[in-house]
Structure formats: structure tokens, C-alpha cells
Amino acid sequence: MAESNFVDYVKIYCRSGKGGRGSAHMRREKYVPNGGPDGGDGGRGGHVILRGNRNYWTLLHLKYDRHVFATHGGNGSKNKSFGKDGEDKVIEVPCGTVVYNAETGEYICDITEHGQEIILLKGGRGGLGNWHFRTATRQAPRFAQPGEPMQELMVILELKLLADVGLVGFPNAGKSTLLSTVSAARPKIANYPFTTLEPNLGIVSYREGKSFVMADIPGIIEGASEGKGLGLRFLRHIERNSLLLFMVPGDTDDIRKEYEILLNELATFNPEMLDKQRVLAITKSDMLDEELIAMLEPTLPDNVPHIFISSVTGLGIQQLKDILWTELNKDSNKLEGVRTETIVHRAKDVAKLQEELKDMGEDEDFEYEYEEDADDDFDYEYEDENWDEEEEKK
């Protein structure tokens, strides 16, 4: 089976740079026998930075490059020369990426906008040179500060796709067919369940050049919230959606019951998903005549807008777009302006997280060695502990 290009989980090891050490150099020039201290400060270690990039929509580019190292700051030198700052390491991620501590499961941050930057690990501050420590009674300090140590962290990046409308339904409900009908997306379509194995996004064109984004996820089956089928892994991709479009085939024995099963699975996975706007689409309605549609109307849920559609004949497609646009632009669900649905992030269960990574082949042990250098064995003296005060004055 070919490996999927859609990667929404990745585990990476990050390490910031350590600060360069300050110089304890004493000025020595011809005709200047007592030049005094002139050691410069060490440079700052490089940060590890996360940056949102709308040109990415999966984490595939990080799957095979999972060791992220920023560079160390340079050491201070004579003539109050400051060390060079370490180079920051920027990790480009798709908008909608959530970051967790891989060891504790603790939520760290969330990237939701293009160009948004968050410092994941700060580089160590550079050590102060000896000229900072000169006083009236200590005019030739022969010591300096070392740089602050680096930081390291194992993190898990989890992608939750950003879309306005999320399609929810059982396998073979016609979700992919609808997406291919209303957008330029071309998901795989076939007459058997679980044709869709990964999420798909499509931009739906509306009137007067307006548009909205629709997300199709693999079909949900009863018990998906307990780990059955593919639905559980991909349910998180509709957590950010402003509106959920439930799709139930018209030839189903009990449309209301199937809708309630889907609703229950979402509630079990995340109760907050029930607060989202909902629309019910009865698909494959080209197989229903007007008399049968009239008989089904009284049996449909009362608390949700519904419409009969057919992606094959185009029945009700434009009306569906109108309903979706109206619901998206309600005061409680404004589409224009802020398009990102705010969600509450909770700490992850580490055991479940590791199990899911194992199922995806992402549980390999990371082997990395700390490279020692001359600074690690350097013997520093400390006679001034006012690190923060001195650093703030710079």
C-alpha cells in the first residue's frame, strides 16, 4: 500500500542554542600598561521558532527531518567585541497546528494564522564580559559570565485543518462526491465504503466572487469515538470548523436515527462540537420521488435546517450553498472577519498519544548526542550574581 502524503502527526526533537561566554580579556597595548578590562559579551543562542505558513497543508515536510537544532551564540572577544548571535531555527507549519509536550502531554501553543510566530524554545543569553564587573575597588576583574545553557524539548505537532464547513457522515454517504461537485477538489470516489482515507479540502465558489472552505473527512461509523474505523483519528479536523454539514443518504432506513448516531459520536469525542451550527443534507435524493420526500419530511429532525440534494443531477446544490452561506454569516457564527473557530485545548493522555504515534509509525526512538566543547570545562568565577539586572541594562 502506497504511503500517504497526508501527515497530521509528527514527533520532533528541538534544541535551542546556548549563549556564548563573556570574555575576561584585559586591554594590553603599547604605552597602555593598565588598560583595564575590555572583554565583550557572548552572543545569544538561537531560538527555535514556529511559523504559520498557508502554503503547507500537511506536516509531511517534517516527517523525515525531525531533529531541529538552533546554533550557539559566539563568545565575546577583546575590545568589548560582542559574540555573534546564534542563528534562529524556524519551523514552518500549516495553519491549524497544535503543539504538545511529547513527554507530559501538556498543551504548549497553537498556530492559526499565516505568518504567526511563536518562540518554542529560547536561546540562552550570552554571558557578560569582564568590563561589566569593574568597580572602584575592583578595577581588573579577571572573570566573566558563561552563557546560559541551551533548552531541549521533544514535542508532538498535531494538525487540525482550518475550514468553514466540515462534512460529517457515514461511509459512502456522498461526502466526496459533493466536495468534487461544489469545488475543484478531486477526492477519490468509488462505490464502496471507506474510499476516503484522508481529509480533503475544497474551496466552494459562491455568488459575487465570494467563497468558503469545505473539509471532507473519512466516514464515521458507530463507535468511532471509541476508536472504531478511521473516524476517530480524523474527527479533530472538524473541531475548528464553523459549521457542520451532516450528510445522510436518502435510501437510509431511518434518517433521524442515523443523524442522532453521528451527533452522539461527536458529543462523545468532544461535547463542545455540539455548540456548532448544523445543517442536514439528505443525499442521493434523485432516487426519491416527490411523494416519498413529502412522507420523509415529518420524520426529519426539527432543530436543524435540512435540504434534499443530489450531487449527480445537481438537485438542491445551489440552495445548499445559500443555506451554508446564510448559516456561516449569522451573528453567532460570523464568517467574514475571523474565520478561525476558537477551541479549548486540553492536555493529551501520553499513553494514548504514544499508542497513536506507534500506529502511525512515528514512535521511533530519537538518538542524539550532546556535543561537548571547550566551554563545558571552562572554570568560571562568580562574584556578581546580578545577571538579570546587568542584562536589562544592555
Swiss-Prot record:
Localization terms from the record: Cytoplasm
Compositional bias (Acidic residues): 361-394
Keywords in alphabetical order: Cytoplasm, GTP-binding, Hydrolase, Magnesium, Metal-binding, Nucleotide-binding
InterPro entries given in the database record: G_OBG (IPR031167), GTP-bd (IPR006073), GTP-bd_Obg/CgtA (IPR014100), GTP1-OBG_CS (IPR006074), GTP1_OBG_dom (IPR006169), GTP1_OBG_dom_sf (IPR036726), OBG_GTPase (IPR045086), P-loop_NTPase (IPR027417)
Coiled coil: none
CDD domains referenced in this protein's UniProt entry, alphabetically: Obg
GO BP annotations listed: ribosome biogenesis
UniProt-listed Enzyme Commission number(s): 3.6.5.-
Main location as per UniProt: cytoplasm
Residues the record lists as binding GTP: 169-176, 194-198, 216-219, 283-286, 310-312
Highest taxon listed in the record's lineage: Bacteria
Segments of this protein annotated with the region Disordered: 358-394
GO MF term set: GTP binding; GTPase activity; magnesium ion binding
All residue ranges annotated as the OBG-type G domain in the record: 163-329
Binding site for Mg(2+): S176, T196
Enzyme type, top EC level: hydrolase
Domain Obg intervals: 4-162
Cofactor(s) annotated in UniProt: Mg(2+)
Gene3D superfamilies the UniProt entry points to: GTP1/OBG domain (2.70.210.12), P-loop containing nucleotide triphosphate hydrolases (3.40.50.300)
GO cellular component: cytoplasm
Task performed by this protein: An essential GTPase which binds GTP, GDP and possibly (p)ppGpp with moderate affinity, with high nucleotide exchange rates and a fairly low GTP hydrolysis rate. Plays a role in control of the cell cycle, stress response, ribosome biogenesis and in those bacteria that undergo differentiation, in morphogenesis control.
Oligomer status and interactors: Monomer.
HAMAP family registered for this protein in UniProt: GTPase_Obg (MF_01454)
Family assignment from sequence similarity: Belongs to the TRAFAC class OBG-HflX-like GTPase superfamily. OBG GTPase family.
NCBIfam families associated with the record: Obg_CgtA, PRK12297.1, PRK12299.1
Protein name per UniProt: GTPase Obg
Gene symbol of the encoding locus: obg
